[in-house]
Amino acid sequence: SDYSFDEHFGKPISSYPPRSVLFDYIQGRVRKSDVRKYIRFNTTTRWVEYNEETKQFKVILDDLVNNRTYTEIFDYLVVATGHFSTPNMPYFEGVQDFPGIIMHAHDFRGADQFKDKDVLLIGSSYSAEDIGVQSYKHGAKSVTISYRSQPLGMDWPEGMKEVPLLEKFEGDLGYFSDGTSQRFDAVVMCTGYQHKFPFLPDELRLKTANCLYPENLYKGLVFNKLPNLLYLGMQDQYYTFNMFDAQAWFARDIMQGKIKLPNEEQRNDDIKLWMELSAANKNHDDEVDFQTDYVKDLIAATNYPSFDLDAVAVLFKQWLKDKDENILEYRDKTYTSVITGTKAEKHHTVWLDEMDDTFERFLSIGPKKEKEVETL
């Protein structure tokens, strides 16, 4: 809430910026906060050990520039590596003999490679939804989404469909659990990620699926068995930057002694309460309300700048509604910022016609001219 898109770009932008634009915004926030001076670059955390007697962490580090391994001692350890970097790659019989493109959504950088191809997406969450419509937009011959438990259930355009889980491949032919089969040119595994912490011993590792409230984390970030070990950003997310900020402020106040933690039993009771609330969620709107209450709970314990979280929740629910109503056109919608009160600008080109996601193109003032389109 302390660095708006309006401030960074000097004007309102549209509500669905591509990754290059988000990256530029993040770089701007890094420059404004001058945080780089606190970061030790070209350094890898090799291993961590906890000393029960001293209540400290021994961290073994590799200096990649000087080819040097060294050790440092810390009172607190904050794990903020995220959980969207280690792809979960399930095995399907015959996949090793599939002759076409196989990738994980983690490595997807553009759907133009799928033009005129039959594309199979395995998984039924945001990645499958997004890569599916991107592939449709860029001219895929067909897009098939294979789900394990339940379909996304969108009103897909002609050429897109959902089928039950893939069972096996025979060459380029995929067989599904409903008895159907189809040939494919490309497969994208939209099968999620693993929480992976190879630098931590087993007893310090967070072990959880992707969920709104990981087990064993008090307030969603304090490792209950060892409260000077903190995990940031390990939840499934509706809120992103604001939630990360709220967690960081909470962690800061713990380390500075401003927040006094209850004992382990009390912390465990609080975890159970939040997990019960999470389990009671019946739909996406419930999940939005749950995470809104969670962020409110964090902010109430610190001096993080307050803002209207209920209004943010309304926007999330409108976004969900807009997607359900038209999966191909919802990105053309604009919303009013809760932080600045300004309404987003409508993008100069409707999403289905926009084939260029570069930073320069996004911030240009108008649609491409006919000759420019012909040269793409």
Model-predicted segments: where are they?
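Conserved N-terminal glycine-rich FAD pyrophosphate-binding loop of Rossmann-like flavoproteins
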Residues: 1
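Feature captures the FAD/FMN-dependent oxidoreductase FAD-binding
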Residues: 5-76, 81
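Glycine-rich dinucleotide-binding loop and its adjacent helix/turn
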Residues: 18, 22-25, 76-138, 144-145, ...
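A Rossmann-like FAD-binding core segment of flavoenzymes
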Residues: 36, 47, 133-212, 225, ...
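Conserved SAM/SAH-binding loop
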Residues: 42-46, 63-65, 106-109, 165-166, ...
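Short hydrophobic core segments
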Residues: 45, 59, 71-84, 119-122, ...
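FAD-site-proximal beta/loop scaffold in flavoenzymes
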Residues: 101, 107-110, 190-239
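C-terminal, flexible cofactor-proximal segment of oxidoreductases
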Residues: 228-376
